[in-house]
Amino acid sequence: MTNPDSPSLSLTPPEALSPAEARAELERLASRIAELDDAYYRDDAPLVTDADYDALRQRNAEIERLFPDAILKNSPANRVGTAPSSAFAKIRHRVPMLSLDNVFDTEEFAEFCARARRFLNLPASPRFVAEPKIDGLSISLTYENGILTRAATRGDGMEGEDVTANVRTLRDVPQTLHGEAPAFIEIRGEVFMSKAAFLELNETQARLGQKIFANPRNAAAGSLRQLDASVTANRPLALFAYAQGESSAPVAETHWDYLTRLKDWGFVVNPLSQLIEDENAAAAFTTRIAAGRSTLPYDIDGVVFKIDDLSLQRRLGFVGRAPRWATAWKFPAEQATTVLEKIDIQVGRTGALTPVAHLQAVNVGGVLVTRATLHNEDEIARKDVREGDTVILQRAGDVIPQIVSVVLEKRPDGARPFAPLEHCPVCGSLAIRPPGEVVRRCTGGLTCEAQVVERLIHMVSRPAFDIDGLGEKSILEFHRDGLVSGPADIFRLPAREDEIARRDGWGSLSARNLSQAIEARRSIPFDRFLYALGIRRIGETNARLLARHYGSFTEWRTQMLAARQIGSDERLALGSITGIGPTIAEELVDFFAEPRNIDTLDELAGMLTITAPSGGLSSAALDSPLNGKIIVFTGTLQAMTRPEAKARAESMGAKVTDSVSKKTDFVVTGADAGSKAKKAAELGIRTLSEEEWLALAGGG
């Protein structure tokens, strides 16, 4: 298991990230999660605990929620498992074997229920089936005319490994279904090993001098994924059946009835499965199962809740890698008590000041922990955390362990409340907490050493200077070795071409190509230059708005210097620019309030030719008539609920908003459409009837 104190894990809360940092963090998370998936699903050798893995996925999901424009094509949210091993033949699942989203408490489960109700427009939550979440290996079994013909692991969710010969050796897998069954059906289940069988297997392995398994899940996965089926036959594997894939004919109208059919066909279904009538019953069931967890003969890590009505499951469908009609209520991680020795301030690459607790080393859930995130100064004040306190630590819900509470009776005399820093501990610039925000930020921007690398990477990115051959890796190397310490140094690199050519991995041709690429970017449109500065909240769209409003770099600089004066005409004008507003205006004023930012800005601008703003927006070829459009729904739709319509529109690339503005492209009007339809008419925005919407969206 890896140590969560590894510096590769960011301590910066998602809400404190800039768009550039969010993209970089999502790329790191995608790479790390893929690595962990390979280790878990393909190699049967997990590198981190389940709680740490869930926390990584939670962090990824939260960053994607806050920064939808930064979502990667290979997002872990759209991926399950890992590619099948080349040692096995591949079998494609007719119905993908997707994963489940997680909840960790009653509040999150209530929100899961509320989302389903809103999507389906139901007055109350539907009935659920609850099943203990077995910690094993998912399997798909194909039966044709009642006879087992194929068995495949989950793999990457779309394609799994052919383990048919091995599965035939499992006692819990019927070779022929008992009674009547569809001509073709896929049955899903979980292969696992009991705790007693696991201990017995490891004793045998040790006696024979063979591999010792880390836990029952690893033992089950390793036993099933044997190239020699006779090895699998001698391993004590079991299976609980729990779901259906493709079927040539309907089997049941409810999931509960389907479980009954599985038992009729000869499968073992977890006897603890239960019908659940409401959210209170779900919470009670989870509490009861968690309390008896240690007494069960097999490992579980939570409870799975599925909406019982299969017709509702079909209506709800899927989002990303998970169904909307099911969730896994994961059990909480372990807690431990330790002493908070010091509160340190970490400055993130976007200037966010994040407090970090340095702890006396303590073992939590099998991992030695020495640090924990404190998130922000409000969180410290809310929990009244002080240096010297004895604290309760928990490793659930975040990549870095969290302090849950303080043991007040053990507080030492003289322990002082935390006092927020007013200046950056790295560069000394003013640290400002904008109104309405929880994060304090360094205003050093272009000059703070903690931020400079991220700023430089952002500066050379495609929407900014777009310097070919100068990416993140080169920036990191050049900064490490002293070739680049600030933005203007980028344009001094051609003068050091010979030095770069002598570097490992470069050579004369590469160095010359880099010099030419840099020289080609000495002329840049004003809007791209603005974006390249990396000022918080100044993305591509806002950079265009500002560039078009001020017209030139010189005019913008003059106006911004004047806008530093509270109440000045220039400051009022800045906040009144359409699409900018007071929050973004404050970011610009804060940037120009730091003299070193102005010096760095002038130094960079002096090396460039900053031309007029670029023309219209660039966009990819449209895959559908809705791609890139802004849509508002109003009134009652007949063919689908509002959430279903929104999901349809978003799946085709549209953005759905709740209010009509000049930016709105279409307003879809259902029955009893109200003020939104009227406003659309006033603004001259095209309205669509439900029939026209369905035609545009590809039918009902």
Curated annotation (Swiss-Prot):
Its EC number is 6.5.1.2. The keyword Magnesium applies. It comes from the Bacteria. GO terms for biological process: DNA repair; DNA replication. One of its GO terms (molecular function) is metal ion binding. It catalyses: NAD(+) + (deoxyribonucleotide)n-3'-hydroxyl + 5'-phospho-(deoxyribonucleotide)m = (deoxyribonucleotide)n+m + AMP + beta-nicotinamide D-nucleotide. Keywords: DNA damage, DNA repair, DNA replication, Ligase, Magnesium, Manganese, Metal-binding, NAD, Zinc. Its cofactor is Mg(2+); Mn(2+). GO terms for cellular component: cytosol. NAD(+) binds at D50, A51, D52, Y53, D54, S99, L100, E131, R154, E190, K306, K330. Residues 1-22 are annotated as: Disordered. Zn(2+) binds at C424, C427, C442, C448. Residues 1-11 have a biased composition (Polar residues). It holds the Pfam family DNA_ligase_OB. Residues 621-700 form the BRCT domain. Belongs to the NAD-dependent DNA ligase family. LigA subfamily. HAMAP family: DNA_ligase_A. This is DNA ligase. It comes from Granulibacter bethesdensis (strain ATCC BAA-1260 / CGDNIH1). The gene is ligA.
